[in-house]
Amino acid sequence: MSPPIKTVAVLVANPALSSILSMTLAGASSLRVRPFDTQLALMTYLHLAPADLVVADFDSVPSRADRLAEDLRGDRAITSRDLQIIALASALTAETKMASIHAGIDEIIMKPMSPRYLVERVLARLAKKKTLRPERRALRRTDWSRFGDNVVPLFRHEPAL
């Protein structure tokens, strides 16, 4: 039985780089590649069909990888919740690192890179499951009385004697 085919969306600044990456990724038999010219086209596609991974570019002026990742993570209409994002960057600065962490980018690959290296990283990223971040919840008040008299509440407001 063949492994399921995974969908990879590619959105980079340079059309030549986009075609090279798309052609190289399409060489892997387990990948279906969808290149996009604009962020709007990518978002529209993701509303209609799920993708497993997005390759984005930090050098893309209209849609930087961190802004794209924030939009993808914040959009509840996108069907795939475990969407992974790989960003391509020509320079890795502290600002780029912080923006990537804040936006939820899973991996950064430095340009120039070998297209084969990108294929290896995409396949490795798709092979392991994405760990979903826990949802933030409000603090619960715990009733410690069920543990008996041995539990001493440290932060209970007691009237002064």
Segments from the language model and where they lie:
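Conserved acidic segment of CheY-like receiver
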Residues: S2-A16, L21-L25, P35, V54-V55
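Short hydrophobic/Thr-rich beta-strand motif most characteristic of the beta2 strand and flanking loop
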Residues: S30-T38, Y45
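Conserved phosphotransfer microenvironments
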Residues: L48, D52-R81
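A short, hydrophobic beta-strand element within the central beta-sheet of small alpha/beta folds
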Residues: V54, T79-A94
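Alpha4 helix (beta4-alpha4-beta5 surface) of REC/receiver domains from two-component response regulators
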Residues: R67, A91-E107
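C-terminal output helix
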Residues: M113-V122
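CheY-like receiver
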Residues: K128-L161
